[in-house]
């Protein structure tokens, strides 16, 4: 599917039945009944997500799904417009960031651990391109909510990030 074809994307959004379940303590995302977890963290999906999420039909569908999920139970959500569009009245908002090189290295290490071949510089460039697209899209642009706490994780370990978030929620 062409990521620029707004009409085709809008039609697919109407057909999409996305649900989240928990199986053996793990979150499972189902698209029309199929577990799609294995696809969600691929480079292809990440890059396509940035392009297609600029389409108003996609943003509308995703916001509806995320708000419905949050209405059912307490949630921790991450996403580029969660604190500004999806859940603007959330009790706690944290804007996690890191330099593009640190994010690229983390992604590179993740892909290498999965046995995938990848190029660190290409990943960095893809991240910067995606950030630019997301910050400049017309619908739900990426920006820090005014009441969000900024946490720059560039020089933090995962344990330090967790400790910081727990302290904020505390």
Model-derived segments and their meaning:
Residues 1-42:
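N-terminal phosphate/diphosphate-binding loop that engages ATP/GTP or pyrophosphate donors
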Residues 12, 126, 168:
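Short acidic/histidine-centered micro-motifs embedded in hydrophobic/aromatic stretches
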Residues 4-8, 44, 53, 57, ...:
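Charged, alpha-helix-enriched surfaces in structured cytosolic catalytic cores
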Residues 164-170:
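C-terminal alpha-helix
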Residues 37-46, 53, 57-114:
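ATP-dependent NMP and nucleoside kinases share a basic, alpha-helical "lid"
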């Amino acid at each position: 599917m062409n990521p620029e074809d707004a009409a085709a994307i809008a039609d697919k959004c109407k057909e999409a039945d996305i649900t989240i379940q928990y199986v053996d303590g793990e979150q499972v995302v189902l698209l029309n009944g199929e577990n799609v977890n294995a696809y969600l963290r691929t480079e292809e999906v990440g890059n396509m997500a940035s392009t297609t999420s600029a389409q108003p039909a996609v943003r509308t569908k995703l916001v509806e799904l995320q708000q419905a999920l949050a209405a059912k139970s307490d949630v921790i959500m991450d996403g580029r417009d969660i604190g500004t569009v999806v859940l603007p009245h959330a009790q706690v908002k944290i804007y996690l960031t890191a330099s593009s090189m640190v994010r690229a290295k983390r992604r590179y290490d993740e892909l290498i651990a999965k046995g995938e071949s990848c190029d660190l510089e290409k990943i960095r460039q893809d991240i910067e391109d995606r950030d630019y697209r997301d910050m400049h899209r017309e619908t739900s642009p990426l920006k820090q909510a005014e009441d969000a706490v900024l946490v720059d994780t560039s020089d933090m370990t995962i344990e330090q990030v967790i400790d910081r978030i727990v302290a904020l929620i505390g």
